[in-house]
């Protein structure tokens, strides 16, 4: 019915003090919160969003009491590595359920550009009936798919595309996302040397060489898997990259047959891959993006 966002990167100290001072009296807590935010939640199904919750761990700890209170639903968002690290002196609430958030897929991208009623039903019908679309329709759909691949599925990038921004402006948005990724990787690397950052930077090169598996020798000629496995796991768990692990037998319990030392890494988003490849350029111009849409996107498939 309604929602409220508490962005702890921007909230003033009075809002934060309310969490510290009034958890034992939730009537007072909500009264103060609504007064400080200038808004009262109305309706039976309302949600309060704790954005950048890693910046204020006390709010995360308060979830235990707020959920038990039952008045509202709660969503927490934030940087995975900082959420993991900023837990000193707080009790991590068992009421938390982690939900993985993925980039928008092709169907969701089509929803965003108001094409939810044409392309996907056409593809689905052709697939179910095993009926070809014809060259003209196939070309039209593939152009839309290639556009999705270069824009990618990050909501900010898709929003920029839908808003009519140029490809150069969309590329700027994606460069900013990559910079945020690099900051998270750097935080990890402060305790683990420069392992995750180097691995992440080599993903496009690894894919371009079409190796059957990720070659750690391209990271460091003396590298051993056991010295880098935690960094690889972090990249995968943070969903900055997608880890594909070899299995020795195609059985139901794949985990029993996983050969974790034999793996490949892919970028988590094709649009970010395109921008990562072009990162040595100051910006990526319109003509280059249009050329990519036409014929040059095999690297992340």
Language-model regions, residue ranges each:
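Accessory nucleic acid-recognition modules appended to NTPase machines
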Residues: 159-301
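Structural recognition of the conserved hydrophobic beta-strand(s) that form the central parallel beta-sheet
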Residues: 49-51, 73-79, 100, 109
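Conserved nucleotide-binding/hydrolysis micro-motifs of P-loop NTPases
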Residues: 9-13, 80-84, 103-107, 248, ...
């Amino acid at each position: 019915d309604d929602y409220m966002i508490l962005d702890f990167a921007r909230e003033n100290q009075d809002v934060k003090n309310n969490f510290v001072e009034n958890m034992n009296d939730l009537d007072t807590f909500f009264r103060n919160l609504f007064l400080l935010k200038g808004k009262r939640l109305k309706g039976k199904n309302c949600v309060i969003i704790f954005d950048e919750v890693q910046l204020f761990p006390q709010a995360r700890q308060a979830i235990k009491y707020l959920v038990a209170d039952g008045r509202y639903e709660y969503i927490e968002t934030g940087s995975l590595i900082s959420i993991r690290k900023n837990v000193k002196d707080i009790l991590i609430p068992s009421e938390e359920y982690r939900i993985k958030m993925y980039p928008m897929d092709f169907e969701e991208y089509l929803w965003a550009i108001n094409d939810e009623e044409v392309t996907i039903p056409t593809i689905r019908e052709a697939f179910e009936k095993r009926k070809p679309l014809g060259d003209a329709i196939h070309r039209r759909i593939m152009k839309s798919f290639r556009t999705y691949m270069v824009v990618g599925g990050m909501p900010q990038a898709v929003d920029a595309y839908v808003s009519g921004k140029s490809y150069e402006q969309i590329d700027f948005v994606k460069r900013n996302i990559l910079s945020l990724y690099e900051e998270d990787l750097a935080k990890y690397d402060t305790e683990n040397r420069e392992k995750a950052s180097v691995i992440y930077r080599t993903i496009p090169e690894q894919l371009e060489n079409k190796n059957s598996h990720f070659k750690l020798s391209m990271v460091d000629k003396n590298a051993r898997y056991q010295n880098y496995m935690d960094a690889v796991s972090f990249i995968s768990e943070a969903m900055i990259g997608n880890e594909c692990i070899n299995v020795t037998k195609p059985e139901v319990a794949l985990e029993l047959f996983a050969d974790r030392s034999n793996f490949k890494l892919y970028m988590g988003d094709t649009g970010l891959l395109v921008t990562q490849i072009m990162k040595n350029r100051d910006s990526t111009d319109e003509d280059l993006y249009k050329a990519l849409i036409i014929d040059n996107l095999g690297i992340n498939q």
